Amino acid sequence: MVDQVKVVADDQAPAEQSLRRNLTNRHIQLIAIGGAIGTGLFMGSGKTISLAGPSIIFVYMIIGFMLFFVMRAMGELLLSNLEYKSFSDFASDLLGPWAGYFTGWTYWFCWVVTGMADVVAITAYAQFWFPDLSDWVASLAVIVLLLTLNLATVKMFGEMEFWFAMIKIVAIVSLIVVGLVMVAMHFQSPTGVEASFAHLWNDGGWFPKGLSGFFAGFQIAVFAFVGIELVGTTAAETKDPEKSLPRAINSIPIRIIMFYVFALIVIMSVTPWSSVVPEKSPFVELFVLVGLPAAASVINFVVLTSAASSANSGVFSTSRMLFGLAQEGVAPKAFAKLSKRAVPAKGLTFSCICLLGGVVMLYVNPSVIGAFTMITTVSAILFMFVWTIILCSYLVYRKQRPHLHEKSIYKMPLGKLMCWVCMAFFVFVVVLLTLEDDTRQALLVTPLWFIALGLGWLFIGKKRAAELRK
C-alpha cells in the first residue's frame, strides 16, 4: 500500500506522480512546536482551570507524558520504512487495509472537526475588537485566505506554520517573563489582587475541587494536544526525515513544560484560579485584570493566529490524507490528482468547504464556549482513536517485524509496556467524558461516524482496496 506514490526531493519531478520533499528541518521543528500549542491551550484553559484549579498543571503533564510515547511509537514506525507517507500507511500495512481506511478517514474528520472549533475560536477572538461583526464574515475570510495560501506550494505551508509558531512562542515566553516580573514586584491589579505563587496552594490547595474536579479537566486538556502528531503527516514531504523527525519528537517534553506548565503557573499566580472566567481566554484576561488593555489586544491577536495556525495545519493534513486514501482506492479518484505545484488542490478545496460547518455550529449553538466544548469532545475522542491505532500498529510491528526493531535508529523506550499503559489511559479519559452533560452528548454522537465508516468500507472501500491490490 505504501509504494503507490513516489516521494521525491526534486522540484522538477512530475507533479501528477509525486509529493515533494520541500519541508526543511527548520519547518519541521516549528510545525511540531506549533502543533503542540493548539487552540485548546488558549481557548480551553479557562474552563479547565475553573474545573480543576491548580491541579490542571498535573493534568497537562500526565497527558503530555502519555502522548510523548505515542509519538515515539509513530516515529519508530515511520522511520522503519521511508515509503510510509503517514501513519495511515503503516496502519494499512501492519493491521490491514481496513485500518488504513478507518485511520485515514477518521484523521481527516478529526481535522475537519478541529478546524470547525478553530473557526468558532477565531469568531470569538474577532469579537474582542469587533463585537458587532457577523460570525460568518470572520470565518469565511480566514477559510478563503488559508485555501489561497495552501494552493501555492507545500513550502508556503511550511513558511506559514513557521511564522505562526514563532508568534505563539514569542507570546507565551513574553507572558511567562511578564508574569514572573509581576510576581517578583508583588504587582497589584486594580481589584487589589497581588500577584503571588501562593495563589497556587492558598486558595483551597492544589486540588480545590477534589478528584472529581481534577478528572473533569482532562477532556478539554486532551484537545489542547491535538496536532501533536502532525509531523507524522509531513513524512513524505520532509527533507532528511531520519534527523528531523526524531529531533522534533524528542523536544516534546521540553515544549510541554515551557508552553503548558510554566504558562499556567504564571496565569494562576497573577490571577487566582477562582477568579478565572471559564468562558474567556485566561491569556487575554490576565492582562485585562492587571489593567493593560493594549497588551490584551496583542495577546488576543496571538491567540487568533494560534487558531488560524491550527486551521492551517488541518487544511494541510486533511488534503494529504485524502490524497493517500485516493491512492489506495478508498476515496474519490479526483483527490489523488496533484496540481502543477505538487499540491492536492481538490482535497484542499473540499476540506475548506467542510470547515464552513463551524459557522453552522454557531447558529445551532449560539454559545461560543458551548459550541467549542461540544466540538472539542468529538475531536478528542476521534484523535484518541487515531493515537490508539498508532499504538496497535506498533505492537504488531514488534511482533511481526522484530528485525526492523532491532536495527531501528529510533527505538521507542519501554515500547510494548507503554503501548498498553497509553491505551488504558485513553479508555480512562473516555470514561471521564461520560461524567459531564456537555461532553456526554458528544460522546453519544461520535459512534455515528464509525457506523458510517463501517458501512462505507463494507459496501465500497473493501471492494476498491481489493481491486487496487490486484
UniProtKB/Swiss-Prot annotation:
Transmembrane residue ranges: 30-50, 51-71, 102-122, 137-157, 162-182, 211-231, 256-276, 283-303, 350-370, 371-391, 413-433, 441-461
InterPro entries for the chain: AA-permease/SLC12A_dom, Amino_acid_permease_CS
Record's catalysed reaction(s): D-alanine(in) + H(+)(in) = D-alanine(out) + H(+)(out); D-serine(out) + H(+)(out) = D-serine(in) + H(+)(in); glycine(in) + H(+)(in) = glycine(out) + H(+)(out); beta-alanine(in) + H(+)(in) = beta-alanine(out) + H(+)(out)
Activity regulation note: Beta-alanine uptake is inhibited by carbonyl cyanide m-chlorophenylhydrazone (CCCP), which dissipates the proton motive force.
Compartmental location: Cell inner membrane
GO molecular function: beta-alanine transmembrane transporter activity; D-alanine transmembrane transporter activity; D-serine transmembrane transporter activity; glycine transmembrane transporter activity; L-alanine transmembrane transporter activity; symporter activity
Annotated keywords: Amino-acid transport, Cell inner membrane, Cell membrane, Membrane, Symport, Transmembrane, Transmembrane helix, Transport
Pfam families linked: AA_permease
Any Gene Ontology CC annotation: plasma membrane
Induction of synthesis: In complex media, expression is negatively regulated by Hfq and the small non-translated RNA GcvB. Hfq is required for the GcvB effect.
Topology with respect to the bilayer: Multi-pass membrane protein
Major location category of this protein: membrane
Segments on the Periplasmic face: 123-136, 183-210, 277-282, 434-440
Cytoplasmic face residues: 1-29, 72-101, 158-161, 232-255, 304-349, 392-412, 462-470
Disruption phenotype annotation: Mutant exhibits increased resistance to D-cycloserine when grown in a minimal medium, but no change in D-cycloserine sensitivity compared to its parental strain when grown in a complex medium.
One GO process term, biological-process aspect: glycine transport
NCBIfam families: PRK11049.1
Function: Permease that is involved in the transport across the cytoplasmic membrane of D-alanine, D-serine, glycine and beta-alanine. Also contributes to L-alanine uptake. In addition, in minimal media, transports the broad spectrum antibiotic D-cycloserine into the cell. Transports D-cycloserine only in minimal media, and not in a complex medium, suggesting that CycA does not play a role in D-cycloserine transport when E.coli is grown in a complex or biologically relevant medium, probably due to competition from other CycA substrates present in the medium.
Family: Belongs to the amino acid-polyamine-organocation (APC) superfamily. Amino acid transporter (AAT) (TC 2.A.3.1) family.
Protein name in UniProt: D-serine/D-alanine/glycine transporter
UniProt source species: Escherichia coli (strain K12)
